[in-house]
Structure formats: structure tokens, C-alpha cells
Swiss-Prot record:
Organism: Bos taurus
Protein name, UniProt field: Large ribosomal subunit protein uL30m
Key words, A-Z: Mitochondrion, Ribonucleoprotein, Ribosomal protein, Transit peptide
Subcellular location: Mitochondrion
Principal subcellular localization: mitochondrion
Keyword Ribonucleoprotein attributed: yes
Gene giving rise to this polypeptide: MRPL30
One GO term describing the cellular component: mitochondrial inner membrane
Length: 161
């Protein structure tokens, strides 16, 4: 093989053109298997349908504002773009929930790594907490953000009397 290529390369340019007119290329790329490719699933598959809302209990007129995203599978042996998105979303540590907005830019990233993560809506039974209440909140495994109400010392003294 190397001898054939060497003899073709060492010939003058005029003879090289005549020698390669009827010759097909020696390297065929049709049989090469590319392990990872980006998703080519059409966007229509990801659009919500009325059946989905009935099945999962969502409301299309009042969508939830925040997602709880948890990584449930490893990123080992996954392509670099999935690892980059996991890092951007702050999901390097498995089974640690992160809160993200329900906006199209974040949803596009979540769609790429949907097979590695679990997404739940964040439920706010007591409403959205204020800045002062953020230190007194607790995120339950059911997806509820509960605000713990602290008692003021004046209230405690009034209750003792």
C-alpha cells in the first residue's frame, strides 16, 4: 500500500493526473461510526399537548415559575457538550437539587440533558418568600418551598403570661 502511494507521489504532475482519473479514493468514510451525535428530534415532540397536561396535572395558562433540577445519572462517557451544560446548570454533584427559572433559554439547555436529570416544578404553598425570609426556608423532597415562621421574643413573652 505504501509502495503504491509512494510511486504515485513521485511521478510528475502530468502523469499523476492521468493515473488518478479512473481511480477511486482509497479512504472510504461511509463505514466510520460516530458514537455521539447531537439530538435530531423535531421540536414538535417537545411542544406541550392537552393530553400531557391532563396526565401530569399541569396548567397551560398558569405554568410554574421555577424548576427543581436534580442530576440522577453520571456524566462519565458522555459528550463534552452535555458535560458543559451540566456544569453551567450547577449540577456537578449528583442528587443535589438546583432551582432554575422556567424560561426558554434554560429549557433549551435542559432539553439537551433531559436523560441525565429529573425536573420537578417548585411549589410555593405560602407564596414567594421575601429576601428576609430566604434564610428561613426549607426545600422538601416533594418540591415544596416551605417558609419557617420564627417567633419574635415579644410574642414568646406574651404567650408565657
Amino acid at each position: 500500500m505504501a509502495g503504491i502511494l509512494r510511486s504515485i507521489v513521485q511521478r510528475p504532475p502530468g502523469r499523476l493526473q492521468t493515473a488518478t482519473k479512473g481511480v477511486e479514493p482509497l479512504v472510504c468514510v461511509d463505514w466510520i461510526r460516530h458514537k455521539f451525535t447531537r439530538s435530531r428530534i423535531p421540536d414538535e415532540v417537545f411542544r406541550p399537548s392537552p393530553e400531557d397536561h391532563e396526565k401530569y396535572g399541569g396548567d397551560p395558562q398558569q405554568p410554574h415559575k421555577l424548576h427543581i433540577v436534580t442530576r440522577i445519572k453520571s456524566t462519565k462517557r458522555r459528550p463534552y457538550w452535555e458535560k458543559d451544560i451540566i456544569k453551567m446548570l450547577g449540577l456537578q454533584k449528583a442528587h443535589t437539587p438546583q432551582v432554575h427559572k422556567n424560561i426558554p433559554s434554560v429549557n433549551a439547555k435542559l432539553k439537551i440533558v433531559k436523560h441525565l436529570i429529573r425536573i420537578k416544578p417548585l411549589k410555593l404553598p405560602q407564596g414567594l418568600p421575601t429576601e428576609e425570609d430566604m434564610s428561613n426556608t426549607c426545600l422538601k423532597s416533594t418540591g415544596e418551598l416551605v417558609t419557617r415562621w420564627l417567633l419574635n421574643p415579644a410574642d414568646q413573652e406574651a404567650k408565657k403570661c
